[in-house]
Amino acid sequence: MSLHLLLAVSLCVALASSLPWAAASANGNGNGKPLVAAITKDAATSLYTVPIKDGRPLVLDLAGALVWMSCAAAHPTLECHHHFCMHAHSYHPPGCPHNGYGRADVEDPFRCKCTAHPYNPFSGESATADLTRTRLSANATDGKNPLYPVSFAAVTSCAPDSLLAKLPAGAVGVAGLARTRLALQAQVARSQKVANKFALCLPSGGGGDGVAIFGGGPLFLLPPGRPDVAATLAGETPLHRNKDLPGYFISATKIAVNQEQVQLYTQEPLVVELCTRIPYTALRPDVYRAVVDAFARATAGRKRVTPPPPPAAPFELCYDSRDLGSTRLGYAVPQIDLVLEGGKNWTVFGGNSMAQVSDNTACLAVVKVKGEKGSPPPPAAIIGGFQMENNLVVFDEEKQRLGFSGLLWGRQTTCSNFNFTLAA
């Protein structure tokens, strides 16, 4: 090779590597910056997805212990004694047999390759499949815009195509976000050298994409000039663990409807789970009855729709929405407050409490918890996706705190107002 050609090649390589997006893509390093991804709500399933697998969507699951997806026939595997194999078996899906950490490698019978147990909570099915490494991708961000693409290696589980049943059309797997070492945000934290912390701003149906930020940092929503939402949260409360489940749990001391305390049968703290698997908040039967009755009393003068029309199932309280009136926080109905450990309120206004089920009918969007015989006692409340929409929710594993902005309509913005235009 001539000296001139060698110098030209060296110069090209140096220039390419000096570009931040090129370095990030090659090294899987976002230079210590958080990553951002768009969140889409699927109209058919009410599930939320992020396009982080070659631009294809994975379903967000706050209770999912693993990231799993369909794999190519040829893929790398991890050995059974690898520490990630142990982490993959930290939580066992329901109905899945305990059959060890792996199986003999077909290509090398003397090698034990690790298997995991991906679980589809929407179909209730699980499988046994290889633990592998996969490249995922998102964009580095300054909290205002995406900056440049970042590709990084993640430990994931393969899954048979049959496990994709009941996922949104086009989804290739599930991005587990639970409190485990193999959850998506934990792997982003390790690979990008950022905080083990993430924020979800879930969109409402038909209102554009929401935003997920992995690794902490600010979040600015349009219009320009608005303050950092992550720095102006309405409240925080401690996160608690459940020894049997890897999801996110907080504690409430009481519930109020229309600023009056709801009388419950227990004086014990109320366990509350946050969950993207269900569309609407589910309440334990005793809590459900007390809350629904209190809401009915507080709306006694409003025009009820009885019996509720078929589209309203499984809701109990439905109203003629033309009679409700409106505010910038949604329908003018009594607010519901969860009074949390530490004293802050998670307040549910009409925008998150009332689901529009037909042109002129809106219903109180809470349901009863579905319990199964032999399963652990359910939480008092499971906050579903609808009640988290247009509300920045911050999950901070390092501080073991949960933060929330409250309904962003009150700030005259929404979760669909992040500027996804790539910064120049």
Swiss-Prot record:
It comes from the Eukaryota. One of its GO terms (cellular component) is apoplast. Glycans are attached at residues 139, 345, 419. Expressed in roots. Expressed at low levels in leaf sheaths, stems and flowers. Induction: Induced by infection with an incompatible race of the fungal pathogen Magnaporthe oryzae. It holds the Pfam family TAXi_N. SUPFAM superfamilies: Acid proteases. Chitinase that possesses antifungal activity. Inhibits the growth of the fungal pathogen Rhizoctonia solani by degrading the fungal cell wall. Does not possess inhibiting activity against fungal endo-1,4-beta-D-xylanases belonging to glycoside hydrolase family 10 (GH10) and family 11 (GH11). Involved in the regulation of plant growth by regulating the intracellular calcium ion concentration in roots. This is Chitinase CLP. The gene is CLP.
